């Protein structure tokens, strides 16, 4: 794998060079403006190309080190592209209204994520049929509301290591929170925006659908390149695989219904930190699709016991769950 290639022609065809009306400009963007045509500012793509490459390299390096990328784009024309790119690259996204404190008050947000998981479990299990129609509707509405806001980050397990933003004016709260926590920000910055405080500025049109689709595709491919590099460092030859790695149900008899991972998300956690887990037991857990503490922390007692039996340590598994919850909380 390698960083995604792109050309200036692609940027031109996507309309990346079109800024806003000249009277709406932010003077701090003057260095990135080529000129004006029909009272519309034209962005200097000769600067956009190297700056985009710099942002792509940062994304790839972050993921290669086991970091998380958070895509942020809540405007209508960015919502689908942001979600698709994040899912395709095994990253995370916010494409509905940004909740204040999503980053700076992660502990509270984690509580809401736990509630979302609880609702999904309640409505998806046999117990869900015990509720009246009205009760079930109320629970579904609560779940849907939480899913709109948190569905894209419910598996994140902690703060992101870099956020990628479409439209810095609209996502100013997200950017402020990231800056407060020292989280790098890569952003598409239009002619009406302020580039101050953005770690990786990419001058470009933040309104055109084709341009947004191009940005999201490039960032997603850079993240996939980072995953490939991380797996290469771990001795996994991605090119030799018969099919691309993807999350699917792990083959198991006793653990039927448990959804494992086909491979780690970034760098796998050291499961040998859990009491009684040797290298051999860790390999058995990996064979079941378990690579991270958060996976164990989320197990219900029945599934946890089945997994304990599968690896030959049923008496230890309750301790693993509590230890994993503690380790996950420490990471957050």
From Swiss-Prot:
Entry's Gene Ontology BP terms: translation
UniProt keyword annotation of Protease present: no
One Gene Ontology term of the molecular function aspect: structural constituent of ribosome
Origin: domain of life: Bacteria
InterPro entries attached to this UniProt entry: Ribosomal_uS2, Ribosomal_uS2_bac/mit/plastid, Ribosomal_uS2_CS, Ribosomal_uS2_flav_dom_sf
Keywords: Ribonucleoprotein, Ribosomal protein
UniProt KW NAD keyword: no
SUPFAM superfamilies recorded: Ribosomal protein S2
Entry similarity comment: Belongs to the universal ribosomal protein uS2 family.
HAMAP family: Ribosomal_uS2_B
Annotated protein name in UniProt: Small ribosomal subunit protein uS2
Native source organism of the sequence: Afipia carboxidovorans (strain ATCC 49405 / DSM 1227 / KCTC 32145 / OM5)
Gene expressing this chain: rpsB
């Amino acid at each position: 794998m390698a960083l995604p290639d792109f050309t200036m022609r692609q940027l031109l065809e996507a309309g990346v060079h079109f800024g806003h009306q000249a009277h709406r400009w932010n003077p701090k963007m003057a260095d990135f403006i080529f000129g004006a045509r029909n009272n519309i500012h034209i962005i200097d793509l000769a600067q956009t190309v190297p700056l985009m490459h710099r942002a792509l390299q940062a994304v790839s390096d972050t993921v290669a080190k086991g970091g998380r990328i958070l895509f942020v784009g809540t405007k209508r024309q960015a919502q689908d592209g942001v979600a698709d790119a994040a899912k395709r690259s095994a990253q995370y996204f916010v494409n509905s209204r940004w909740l204040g404190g999503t980053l700076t008050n992660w502990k509270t947000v984690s509580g809401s994520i736990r509630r979302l998981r609880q609702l999904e479990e309640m409505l998806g299990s046999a117990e869900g049929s015990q509720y009246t129609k009205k009760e079930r509707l109320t629970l579904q509405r609560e779940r849907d509301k939480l899913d709109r806001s948190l569905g894209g980050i419910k598996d994140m397990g902690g703060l992101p290591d870099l956020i990628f933003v479409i439209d810095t004016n609209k996502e100013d709260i997200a950017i402020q929170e990231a800056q407060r926590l020292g989280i790098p920000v890569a952003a598409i910055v239009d002619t009406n925006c302020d580039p101050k405080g953005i770690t990786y500025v990419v001058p470009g049109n933040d309104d055109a659908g084709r341009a947004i689709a191009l940005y999201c595709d490039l960032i997603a491919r850079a993240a996939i390149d980072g995953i490939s590099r991380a797996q290469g460092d771990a001795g996994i030859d991605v090119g030799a695989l018969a099919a691309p790695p993807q999350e699917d149900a792990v083959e198991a008899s006793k653990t039927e219904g448990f959804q494992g991972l086909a491979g780690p998300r970034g760098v796998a956690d050291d499961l040998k930190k859990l009491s009684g887990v040797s290298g051999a037991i860790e390999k058995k857990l990996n064979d079941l699709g378990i690579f991270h503490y958060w996976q164990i922390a989320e197990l219900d007692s029945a599934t946890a016991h089945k997994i304990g039996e599968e690896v030959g340590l049923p008496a230890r598994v309750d301790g693993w769950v509590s230890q994993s919850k503690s380790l996950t909380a420490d990471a957050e």
